[in-house]
């Protein structure tokens, strides 16, 4: 059995919050997915006010905005994983 060859990396749809310190959330998901050989498609769900020790605030994004962004990506890309 031969391994399948992909000319483009598989797309992973990620729903996550934004961590401005880079230790978690979308900012950490993107390089982890890239390191595994996939392409990250990010849908932010929340904005946080935090540093590398404490979370001071979490602001959830409007669910309709999250849904709309996800649908745009689903319509355009072949999603391999969520």
Model-derived regions: residue spans:
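Small-residue (G/A/S/T)-rich helix-start motifs and N-terminal tracts that mark the onset
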Residues: 1-81
């Amino acid at each position: 059995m031969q391994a399948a060859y992909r000319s483009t990396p598989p797309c992973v749809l990620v729903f996550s919050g934004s961590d401005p310190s880079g230790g978690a959330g979308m900012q950490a998901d993107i390089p982890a997915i890239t390191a595994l050989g996939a392409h990250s498609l990010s849908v932010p769900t929340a904005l946080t006010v935090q540093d590398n020790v404490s979370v001071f605030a979490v602001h959830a994004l409007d669910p309709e905005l999250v849904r709309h962004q996800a649908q745009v990506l689903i319509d355009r890309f072949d999603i391999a994983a969520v």
